[in-house]
Amino acid sequence: MKATDLFHVTALVAGALALEHQQPLIGDLSQDLNHIIDSSPLLSFHRALVQIPSISEHEKNVGEYVLDFLSSQNLTVEKQIVTPESDTEEERFNIYAYVGKNRQPDVLVTSHIDTVPPFIPYSLHAPTSGTSFIRTDLVIAGRGTVDAKASVAAIVFAALETLDENPNASIGLLFDVGEENSGVGMKHFSNSELNPTPPTYHTVIFGEPTELSLVAAHKGTLGFKLVAEGKAAHSGYPWLGESAISSLIPVLAHLDTLQDLPPEKGGLLRSETLGKSTLNIGRVHGGIAANVVPAHAEAAISVRLAAGTPEDTRTIIERAVAKVTSGDRSVYPDFGDRKAGAPPQYFDVDVDGFEVITVNYGTDAPALKIHDQRTQRVKRYLYGPGSILVAHADNEAITVGELEEAVRGYKRLIAASL
C-alpha cells in the first residue's frame, strides 16, 4: 500500500466490504483504540517491539524481548553473539529459533530487529476524524512499525500458527542486527556453523516492506567516496593554492549524469527488469573556513545497481573521473574494500496468490552466502507488509489489515516451501 493510500478511507472501506468476512464499522472515535491492539496477540507483540527503541548498534533490549517471547512459545532459542558487551559497546546478538532439536531446519524465515534513527514513539490513529472506520484500517505509526518490526511480528505469528497446525513443520527463525547500516548480523550468521556447506535449508524467506507483494528482484549496491586533494592558501591570494572543492565540483557534476547516459556512452548499466542504475551524491564536505582555499574535499556517493557487478560499476566510475580530470590524480574515487558492494538480487516468485514487483532498495539477502548449490538450488523469497516509501520517514506507519494479511502471506510461503 502506498503511503498516501493509508488515509484514503473510502477506497479502503470499499475494498474491505468486498471481503468474504465483513467487519463492523467502528463509529465511536472516542473509544480507546488501544483495546483493538490489546485484543490481538499479534498486534500486542508488534506494539511491544515498536515501543522498544532499537536503532542500529542498540538492539539489545528488543533482542532480549524477542528472545524471551519465543522461549515462552516453547521454541528452542539461541542467542548468537555478534559483538560481545564491553565498556564501550553493548552486547549485540542475532536470535535464532527452531523446534525442539531441529537446529538445521528446511525453511529459514528471517528479518531484522534494528531500525534507522531517530526513535519515533508508537501511536495509533483513526484513518480520518469524524467518520466511522473499519478495524483493519486503524493506522499504527512509529519508528519500525513498517521496517522491519511489522515483518518480525508477522513472521513470528505465521510460524506459530503453522506449528500449531503442523507441529513437525521444519521451520527456523532468524532475527538479525545491523541490517540498516552494515549488515553485520547477517554476515555473522552467514559465516557461522548455522550456515553450513552445503546448506541444510532449501528455502529462505526474507521479511522486508514489499506492500504484500513478492519481489522478483532488487537493485545491488555500491558505496564510495570521491576525494579531492588541493593546497591551502589565503583566500585573498587563491592563485597560491589549489581549491580541492573547485576540483571536486566538475567531477561530481559529471558523475551525476551517469544514470541518464546510455552505457555505450559511459553511463551506468541498465536492465529490463530493474531499469536504470541510479547514483546519489549523499554528502559533500571540505575546507576549514570561508577565507581559506580548501586543501581537501570529499563526497559520499551511493550507487544502486540495476545490472552487472560492483566491479563493473567501479570501472565505469573510474573512467568517468579520468575523463573529467584528464588523469589528474588529485581527484580520485576511493572504493575502500573492493570486495564490498553487491550485485542485483533475484528472487523466486513461483507461489500463486501474490502480485509480483521489483524494488530499488537493498536487503540482507546478499549478505547470506549460500555456499554450495550444486546439488540443490536454495529458493529465496522476499515479502512483507508496509511500504518502503514511508519506512525511513517521519510518517512511518502501517495498518492493522496489512499486518494481519502479512501473517496469512507468510503462512502461504512457508506452506509452499515445506
Curated annotation (Swiss-Prot):
Cofactor or coenzyme needed: Zn(2+)
- Protein name (Swiss-Prot/TrEMBL): Probable carboxypeptidase AO090166000075
**So what EC number does this one have?**
3.4.17.-
Kindly identify the residues recorded as the active site: 179 (proton acceptor)
Source taxon at top rank: Eukaryota
Query: How the cofactor binds, per note?
Result: Binds 2 Zn(2+) ions per subunit.
* Keywords carried by this UniProt record: Glycoprotein, Hydrolase, Metal-binding, Protease, Secreted, Signal, Zinc
